[in-house]
A protein has these predicted regions:
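Walker A/P-loop-proximal flanking segment of P-loop NTPase domains
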Residues: 1-81, 91, 219-237
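Conserved P-loop NTPase catalytic core
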Residues: 102-116, 188-237
Length: 237
């Protein structure tokens, strides 16, 4: 029997013992901020070391088609179990969007402060300012649509939304909470994106709520699924 390593030759960094465990911790936000390891930050190195599954290839093709204005799903949910490659898929789309001359807006819930807002981040990334999107109340669909429409083709990538919404649930906004405002915003966002022919929204949710979340987070998880599920297509990379 032929030894496996003569058929599947390991990368040089594995053979040289340079591969460390932190390289496996894919982080879309660190890529967006330019602070990730080169294996993720450099598009050439990233795709050299990425095995492109049929699911990932199909996902990239659908997103490219949408950004070109040639149809395709406007809202996509990437759903995998923990460690199933969803963040890796988002990073692949992030790099490909640059090849497709598309603008990119990135939201990752983990590093966000509880009082930060997704709409504020969008405005800041697309225009350099949060003017008109500074408050803790969801801005409304028309204002959001105007913002997105002015920056097409546009790829919006959202990861760890449940993590952020759980934190935002503790921030009061009048008789509401920032988590409730975020849910209203996500509904506005999915509806606005559906009306724009060269904008694609890709959002990740875990395939099931993780054990370390409490009952409040489980309710948010179900609400997020309900909001996103109205106009989305689910893909597994």
């Amino acid at each position: 029997m032929t030894a496996f390593h003569t058929i599947a030759v390991p990368h040089e960094d594995i053979l040289a013992g340079r591969l460390t465990l932190d390289v496996f911790a894919a982080d879309l936000w660190e890529v967006h901020k330019g602070r990730a390891p080169d294996e993720y930050l450099d598009p050439v190195r990233f795709f050299q070391k990425t095995y492109q599954t049929e699911g990932l290839a199909n996902l990239l093709a659908v997103v490219e088609k949408r950004l070109q204005g040639a149809g395709g799903d406007p809202v996509i949910q990437v759903q995998t179990p923990f460690g199933g490659g969803k963040t890796h898929a988002l990073i692949a789309m992030y790099h490909k969007a640059a090849e497709w001359d598309a603008r990119r807006a990135v939201v990752v819930g983990t590093p966000m402060a509880p009082t930060d807002t997704i709409w504020g981040l969008f405005a800041e990334q697309l225009t350099g300012s949060r003017a008109g999107f500074e408050g803790l109340t969801a801005p409304g669909r028309e204002a959001l649509r105007d913002l997105l429409s002015a920056h097409q083709p546009l790829l919006i990538l959202m990861d760890e939304v449940l993590e952020y919404a759980t934190k935002a649930a503790g921030v009061p906004v009048g008789s509401s909470t920032l988590a409730a405002q975020t849910l209203a915003f996500l509904q506005e966002l999915t509806e606005a994106v559906a009306t724009l022919d060269r904008t694609c929204l890709v959002v990740t949710l875990p395939s099931s709520v993780l054990e370390h979340y409490d009952e409040g987070a489980e309710r948010l998880f179900r609400q997020l699924q309900k909001v996103a599920g109205r106009v989305e297509k689910i893909y597994t990379p």
